[in-house]
Curated annotation (Swiss-Prot):
It catalyses: (E)-4-coumaroyl-CoA + 3 malonyl-CoA + 3 H(+) = 2',4,4',6'-tetrahydroxychalcone + 3 CO2 + 4 CoA. Pfam families: Chal_sti_synt_C, Chal_sti_synt_N. The gene is CHS. It comes from Betula pendula. GO terms for molecular function: naringenin-chalcone synthase activity. The primary product of this enzyme is 4,2',4',6'-tetrahydroxychalcone (also termed naringenin-chalcone or chalcone) which can under specific conditions spontaneously isomerize into naringenin. This is Chalcone synthase. Induction: By ozone. Belongs to the thiolase-like superfamily. Chalcone/stilbene synthases family. One of its GO terms (biological process) is polyketide biosynthetic process.
Length: 395
């Protein structure tokens, strides 16, 4: 008879958790940032608020966003006027949309990741699903299992209402699942749709308006497993360590509340300051075991909460401009997609590395960091190890 220790040993993987595939998806409806203020004030019947509209135009100009994708279009908003008011009961209408559309968009991203992975979906042992867009029972994890035709025995974890740091959280959880369950293949999906936060303008809460200028829809999926079978699986990044912390003196800096009016979003003015002041401590703790203290020697994936956060982090750490290039590119092409953003950036980085003929998946560098920032103020820090690019792939 096997001892507990022997059973335990047999359950564990040998090597680190590894990202084996990435897929992304957006709704088809694309809105350019230059046109958004006119569209937004017209659709919410707020054109009479001329000063506020000018203010919103300046917010959109400064956002460094070129375009965003949104499930909500003119037709849907015309049918749901309460969603266009600043504070009107509208949760039922919002829930009706997101309960269906969040798993659907997640399916699109997951299907791409599974296709890239190239293995039968019956080999997926775990599913981690994350969304800040609506809640339901059984959850979006259950709906996605059905939509994809995963095995009924797939082990599911549903994460609702985490917010913008959760792209780091899902990787931290997937790492623990993959490394503690030999042969596990974890499908991770983040799917976000702004139908839950969209609302008309008000001059009393400008932080709500900031959200309207930044948020976009998107879903991203990754497959994570340890001890990859390199004859059929292609490792992209290894997940070496992961940490979560609540920043000091940050109570109420970012929060959201699900109410009859939908998900309301609040943030204090100094969020970029709080993050940039504390980020070096997170980096130092994460990279001390590796003896790394030159932050420019790393490849960077940071949740692009907004341009001010990126600017202040860059300046505080003395980062070279190219360090946040992939991060800024995703912000400019998609806006802030909450938890899905960092996975989009991971995808962007490996693609750039392959197409640019780099020697590793991390822009030619060995070590990297992935940061999530969100409500709390909570910070997720994931240490990544890149993988050498096979010679045939880089040509």
């Amino acid at each position: 008879m096997a001892s507990v220790e022997e059973i335990r040993k047999a359950q564990r993987a040998h090597g680190p958790a590894t990202v084996l595939a990435i897929g992304t998806a957006t709704p088809s409806n694309c809105i350019t940032q230059a046109d958004y203020p006119d569209y937004y004030f017209r659709i919410t019947k707020s054109d009479h608020m001329t000063e506020l509209k000018e203010k919103f135009k300046r917010m959109c100009d400064k956002s460094m966003i070129k375009k965003r994708y949104m499930y909500l279009n003119e037709e849907i908003l015309n049918e749901n006027p309460n969603m266009c008011a600043y504070m009107a009961p509208s949760l039922d209408a919002r829930q009706t949309i997101v309960v269906v559309e969040v798993p659907k968009l997640g399916k699109e991203a997951a299907t791409k990741a599974i296709k890239e992975w190239g293995q039968p979906k019956s080999k997926i042992t775990h599913l981690v699903f994350c969304t800040t867009s609506g809640v339901d029972m059984p959850g979006a994890d259950y709906q996605l299992t059905k939509l994809l035709g995963l095995r009924p025995s797939v082990k599911r974890l549903m994460m609702y209402q985490q917010g913008c740091f959760a792209g780091g959280t899902v990787l931290r959880l997937a790492k623990d699942l993959a490394e503690n369950n030999k042969g596990a293949r974890v499908l991770v999906v983040c799917s976000e749709i702004t139908a839950v936060t969209f609302r008309g303008p008000t001059d009393t809460h400008l932080d709500s308006l900031v959200g309207q200028a930044l948020f976009g829809d998107g879903a991203a999926a990754v497959i994570v497993g340890a001890d990859p079978d390199t004859s059929v699986e292609r490792p992209l990044f290894e997940l070496i360590s992961a940490a979560q912390t609540i920043l000091p003196d940050s109570d109420g800096a970012i929060d959201g509340h699900l109410r009859e009016v939908g998900l309301t979003f609040h943030l204090l003015k100094d969020v970029p300051g709080i993050i940039s002041k504390n980020i070096e401590k997170s980096l130092a703790e994460a990279f001390a075991p590796l003896g790394i203290s030159d932050w420019n020697s790393l490849f960077w994936i940071a949740h692009p909460g907004g341009p001010a956060i990126l600017d202040q982090v860059e300046s505080k750490l003395g980062l070279k401009e190219e360090k946040l290039r992939a991060t800024r590119h995703v912000l400019s092409e998609y806006g802030n997609m909450s938890s899905a953003c960092v996975l989009f950036i991971l995808d962007e980085m490996r693609r750039n590395s392959l197409e640019g003929g780099k020697v590793t998946t991390g822009e030619g560098l060995e070590w990297g960091v992935l940061f999530g920032f969100g409500p709390g103020l909570t910070v997720e820090t994931v240490v990544l190890h890149s993988v050498p690019v096979p010679v045939e792939a880089s040509h």
